């Protein structure tokens, strides 16, 4: 990893936001100086940037934050927009036709003129922590927000794990061309040898009290500190981020940044450290205890074929069970079955549960694409798709593109789906894909099907924006 701007760091300010708790480490230093650490991995450039941030005049930051655009429902959009007229949802997901892009650009110009957002006077790094509860357990996840060179996938410096669709990229590119500002960070994961990156962030933050606290719309807690970091600490960071990054969430945003860079380059050569060459990214250690991947279950609005269990016999061992009536017992029973299964098929009429376990070395009946490794075929979404959904339920690629299958990571939503269609639907529960599998397949150049991973919680939009013009 090449670290640009790694010289003397001083605290910019201790900005007090009433009721805010986003953990942001502001590391001050000139952006044009570069130090290099050599490793065997392809290395993108990595540098601080002059972030554009809300000022206290805009209101409490907990009324300004929003999730990324692609997880905001219409109801959530209305609720967020009503909290504050400057909520980031008005930028990320403006309503209307193509005129909405220019309207967002006008918002940003007006907010700057009114002192509601200000750009940091010098390049910064931002350290960001989220605290949340998952399955009854408290988690904390910490990452560094920085500018990472936006290189094509072929470079190997930043690696994808799933495919993208053209529609969202076209939308994001129009927004970027109109505003010249990246609104939300790409979520990246990096290998953290011996926990050095986590140790680094803990050390530079130290025991300082947070500048403030905030609770997001989803109920997650955020904290931030303005912390001074010296050049010694900055030089330490370079070798800790000396390997490829892996996209956890934000593939469309990353590809949009590459497309914008190419579009902007047609207007003239860009200097090596021009902001347009980079994408704002939050980098989280792969072994961070707070790195949570939720499963994404498949909801099929079709009744199970009459002979599906017999037809599964060649490739799967099947364990049948009765679904408990009590909600707590039901959840516990399903989790226990999933722990030793590739998938669990669930019907509410007659409340049957079938745990499916692929037999070692068994071939799947579906039309498995050629050229893939056994590691790719072994992940739950692929076992289900090519071993069950395609050959037995008749779910084709066209059906998937048409949205025949619904998806959810919430068991309550799964049960509601089935209860609304008694005897006419089936749900398939999956285990979460492990981060080791995500990185292993990315290293092999193999991408997972869409809706394979759900990294939780989503990064907040509105902590810091990334202007692309110096």
Which positions does each model-derived feature cover?
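Surface-exposed, charge/polar-rich loops and edge strands
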Residues: 39-470
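Detector for the Zn2+-coordinating histidines of canonical Cys2His2
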Residues: 13
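Cationic, amphipathic, low-complexity segments that mediate targeting or membrane/lipid association
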Residues: 6-9
């Amino acid at each position: 990893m090449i670290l640009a701007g790694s010289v003397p760091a001083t605290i910019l300010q201790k900005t007090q936001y009433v009721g805010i708790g986003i953990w942001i480490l502001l590391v001050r230093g000139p952006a044009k100086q570069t130090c290099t650490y050599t490793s065997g991995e392809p290395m993108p450039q990595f540098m601080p940037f002059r972030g554009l941030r809300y000022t206290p005049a805009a209101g409490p930051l907990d009324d300004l934050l929003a999730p990324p655009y692609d997880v905001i429902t219409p109801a959530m959009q209305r609720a967020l927009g009503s909290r504050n007229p400057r909520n980031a949802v008005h930028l990320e997901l403006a309503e209307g036709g193509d005129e909405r892009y220019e309207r967002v650009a006008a918002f940003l110009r007006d907010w700057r003129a009114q002192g509601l957002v200000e750009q940091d006077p010098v390049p910064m790094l931002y350290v960001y922590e989220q605290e949340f509860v998952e399955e009854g357990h408290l988690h904390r996840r910490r990452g560094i927000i920085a500018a990472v060179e936006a290189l094509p996938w072929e470079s190997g410096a930043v690696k994808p794990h799933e495919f993208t669709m053209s529609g969202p990229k076209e939308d994001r590119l129009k927004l970027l061309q109109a505003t010249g500002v990246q609104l939300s960070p790409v979520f990246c994961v990096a290998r953290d040898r011996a926990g050095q990156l986590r140790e680094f962030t803990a050390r530079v933050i130290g025991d300082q009290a947070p500048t403030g606290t905030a609770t997001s719309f989803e109920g997650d807690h955020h904290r931030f500190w303005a912390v001074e970091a010296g050049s010694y600490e900055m030089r330490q960071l370079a070798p800790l981020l000396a390997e490829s990054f892996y996209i956890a969430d934000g593939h469309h945003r990353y590809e949009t940044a590459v497309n914008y860079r190419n579009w902007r380059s047609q207007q003239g050569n860009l200097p090596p450290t021009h902001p347009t060459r980079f994408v704002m990214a939050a980098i989280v250690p792969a072994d961070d205890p707070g790195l949570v991947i939720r499963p994404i279950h498949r909801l099929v609005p079709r009744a199970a074929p009459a002979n599906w269990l017999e037809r599964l016999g060649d490739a799967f061992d099947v364990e049948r069970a009765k679904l408990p009536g009590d909600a707590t017992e039901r959840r516990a029973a399903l989790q226990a079955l999933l722990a030793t299964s590739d998938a669990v098929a669930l019907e509410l009429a007659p409340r049957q549960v079938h745990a499916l376990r692929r037999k070692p070395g068994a071939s799947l009946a579906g039309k498995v694409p050629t050229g893939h490794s056994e590691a790719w075929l072994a992940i739950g979404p692929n076992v289900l798709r090519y071993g069950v959904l395609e050959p037995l339920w008749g779910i084709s690629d066209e059906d998937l593109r048409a949205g025949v299958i619904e998806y959810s990571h919430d068991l309550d939503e799964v049960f509601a789906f089935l209860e609304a269609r008694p005897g006419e639907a089936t749900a398939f529960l999956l285990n979460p894909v492990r981060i080791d599998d995500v990185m292993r397949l990315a290293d092999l150049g193999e991408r997972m099907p869409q809706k394979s991973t759900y990294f939780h919680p989503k990064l907040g939009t509105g902590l810091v924006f990334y202007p692309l013009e110096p």
